[in-house]
């Protein structure tokens, strides 16, 4: 497990030391050649605190300034999220920010792409199974006796079922896993578990695929990825793959008490979005 950063918000604090050799090599590569480094970050739980209503999620107040200070000093910064790209841009407040002129947001696990240069979103047609599940899901949840407080989030190219508002969120979550997996399979989709949420989406869409393609497009010589949830595990696997190909990488976990799997895989663990902000600020200061 990675070590935690301190509680100080002083951007001149020394960088924390990753707990693994591979992580230390990844950080050293970033610092040695920042102009060849790609930094990828999740949105919810990483740049934005987790809230009960995803529509109310917003980037940490200091996240965008920290990104804007760091982005001009590295090859590229990409936000990789399960949200629609345009929604992440709005909730993050990323558009029109000095320092983020070349930011990329890969939405729907890379199926959508927003570039700050153009300010537009590009995307292929949606999978037909998503529309079928969207129509069937309300009645399906009623028939299987889903817990009261379970609710559906429309995500455009995916549909998510949340249990955070249920009386027992974890029990409601576990009760839905098998039925939703069956529903997803019937329509050619898969289920991605998260923090009290199960997302039904097309196969072949994950943060690992998105990160690999973006790193290769950028010709990066090192990669850092920051995430908080089970949906970030494919991105962690992608960094492992890049490491095996000779590209140094650093895995950072935005730690929480809800999800421990990422912390166990990470080179470095920070204290939620606030800790992510501190890390970004410190990196920017180190690269001055």
Predicted features along the sequence, with ranges:
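Mg2+-dependent phosphoryl-transfer enzymes with acidic/Ser/Thr/Gly-rich catalytic loops
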Residues: 11-20, 34, 60, 208-288
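Structural recognition of alpha->loop->beta junctions
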Residues: 96-112, 182, 262-277
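Conserved Rossmann-like nucleotide-cofactor binding loop
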Residues: 46, 85, 231
């Amino acid at each position: 497990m990675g070590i935690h950063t301190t509680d100080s918000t002083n951007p001149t604090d020394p960088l924390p030391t990753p707990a693994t050799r591979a992580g230390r090599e990844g950080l050293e590569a970033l610092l040695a050649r920042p102009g060849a480094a790609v930094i990828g970050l999740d949105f919810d739980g990483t740049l934005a605190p987790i809230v009960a209503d995803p529509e109310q999620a917003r980037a940490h107040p200091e996240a965008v300034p920290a990104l804007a200070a760091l982005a001009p000093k590295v090859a590229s910064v990409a936000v990789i999220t399960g949200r629609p790209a345009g929604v992440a841009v709005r909730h993050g407040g990323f558009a029109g920010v000095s320092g983020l002129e070349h930011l990329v947001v890969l939405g729907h696990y890379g199926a959508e792409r927003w570039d700050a240069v153009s300010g537009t979103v590009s995307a292929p047609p949606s999978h037909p199974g998503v529309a079928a599940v969207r129509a069937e899901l309300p009645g399906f949840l009623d028939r299987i006796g889903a817990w009261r407080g379970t609710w559906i989030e429309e995500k455009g190219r995916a549909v998510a079922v949340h249990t955070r508002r249920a009386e027992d969120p974890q029990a409601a979550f576990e009760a839905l896993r098998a039925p939703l997996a069956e529903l997803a399979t019937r329509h050619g989709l898969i289920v991605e578990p998260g923090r009290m949420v199960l997302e039904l989406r097309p196969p072949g869409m994950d943060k690992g695929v998105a990160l690999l393609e973006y790193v290769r497009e950028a010709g990066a010589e090192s990669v850092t990825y920051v995430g908080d949830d089970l949906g970030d595990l494919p991105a962690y696997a992608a960094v492992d793959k890049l490491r095996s190909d000779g590209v140094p990488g650093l895995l950072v976990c935005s730690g929480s008490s809800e999800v421990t799997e990422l912390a166990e895989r990470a080179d470095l663990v920070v204290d939620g979005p606030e800790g992510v902000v501190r890390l970004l600020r410190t990196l920017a200061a180190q690269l001055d």
